[in-house]
């Protein structure tokens, strides 16, 4: 198997309910448009000169392997609010960046604040100059069905 350094990426987030916690997770992936591919979990480094997309590419093959950084949480506890967030830190001149993820029993604002702090620290310890932070999140309060919140950065080789 050969891997290619990703050239494009997109930030996505969604929350959904389902008959089980796993079905809720799957339904959130479907809402984001990535429910029929295989997500390959990555750690959190963004390649240099990546192009950020505003919408998913058309006709992604079913079963395609897509490098992805994602945060997720599922719950079946009625009344619980759950959130997932990703923070993307971009360096000066698009020379690379970092992605940090967080998911928990909290509001999306709390999750977003957590990933912002993580991005800032990640850049500081590397001695990199932070140009911009992008954040995406999803939140849901569990009602009578299991629920999931998912946030992802999906990368594409083309």
From Swiss-Prot:
Keyword DNA-binding annotated: no
Modified residues (Pyruvic acid (Ser)): 44
Keywords: Decarboxylase, Lyase, Pyruvate
Transmembrane segment boundaries: none
The protein's Enzyme Commission number: 4.1.1.19
GO MF term set: arginine decarboxylase activity
Keyword Lyase on entry: yes
Top-level lineage group: Archaea
Matching PANTHER family: PYRUVOYL-DEPENDENT ARGININE DECARBOXYLASE (PTHR40438:SF1)
Protein name: Pyruvoyl-dependent arginine decarboxylase
Annotated source species: Pyrococcus abyssi (strain GE5 / Orsay)
Chain's gene name: pdaD
